[in-house]
Swiss-Prot record:
The gene is ureF. This is Urease accessory protein UreF. It comes from Ectopseudomonas mendocina (strain ymp) (Pseudomonas mendocina). UreD, UreF and UreG form a complex that acts as a GTP-hydrolysis-dependent molecular chaperone, activating the urease apoprotein by helping to assemble the nickel containing metallocenter of UreC. The UreE protein probably delivers the nickel. The lineage of its organism: Bacteria, Pseudomonadati, Pseudomonadota, Gammaproteobacteria, Pseudomonadales. It comes from the Bacteria. PANTHER family: UREASE ACCESSORY PROTEIN F (PTHR33620:SF1).
């Protein structure tokens, strides 16, 4: 099978893990008036990529994928525990668990997953998304770097979908925003690949506060 098919499969919005249900605080930022137009949305997403994803979420996910690729199960378990402990709010924790569980359900029914990976997956009833994503990449023979690229792309697409539904932002405007953010997306992947574990870390207080406020938001479309 061509590697491109597997990569497109992993990055596809049709992957049945429910990513479209979550906004990661973006819905609250729009509702509160912090984001009122495409320029403000661009600043919010660029900050998330630069200050949060590139410094912690992306390098942690990449480490998951490398450990799964190498079959280093003890290290993968340690990384999964770190990922679970780093969820700062109830909504963000539930998001990771629900999406990870959905991907687990998918992988269990597919023949591509090898026995060692299947045993590890079976030991986690509600794996975090990072663990399940890494095992999916292993099953579909996707390199760790490409698996991270697929995850970053999926994150950006989901955020743009939130903007189109809530701001609202038109489809052509969303594509223009994508073009402006692609260099930042690329830089985030490169930075993630260059960081050693002792340099992982972010202090995304705005994201945590937005997520906590969203938990109490009166009317909402998204689960985070």
């Amino acid at each position: 099978m061509k590697p491109a098919w597997a990569l497109l499969r992993l990055a596809s919005p049709q992957l049945p893990i429910g990513g479209y249900s979550y906004s990661q605080g973006l819905e609250w930022a729009i509702d509160s008036g912090l984001i009122q137009d495409a320029d403000a949305a661009e600043r919010w997403l660029a900050d998330q990529l630069t200050l949060n994803l590139a410094r912690f979420e992306a390098p942690l996910l990449l480490a998951h994928c490398r450990a799964a690729h190498e079959g280093n199960w003890p290290h993968l378990q340690e990384l999964a525990e770190r990922h679970r402990a780093s969820r700062e709010t109830r909504e963000l924790a539930l998001e990771s668990r629900q999406m990870g569980y959905s991907l687990r359900q998918l992988l269990e029914g597919l023949p591509e997953l090898d026995e060692a990976a299947r045993e590890l997956l079976a030991s986690h009833h509600e794996p975090g998304l990072a663990l399940a994503w890494a095992l999916a990449a292993r099953a579909w023979q996707i390199t760790p770097d490409d698996a991270l690229a697929a995850w970053l792309w999926g994150w950006l697409e989901n955020q743009l979908a939130v903007l189109m539904k809530v701001l609202p932002l038109g489809q052509q405007a969303a594509q223009r925003l994508t073009s402006r953010l692609l260099p930042t997306l690329e830089a985030a992947q490169q930075q993630a690949a260059s960081l050693s574990p002792e340099h992982w870390g972010s202090a995304a207080f705005g994201l945590a506060l937005a997520s906590m406020a969203h938990e109490r938001q009166y009317s909402r479309l998204f689960r985070s």
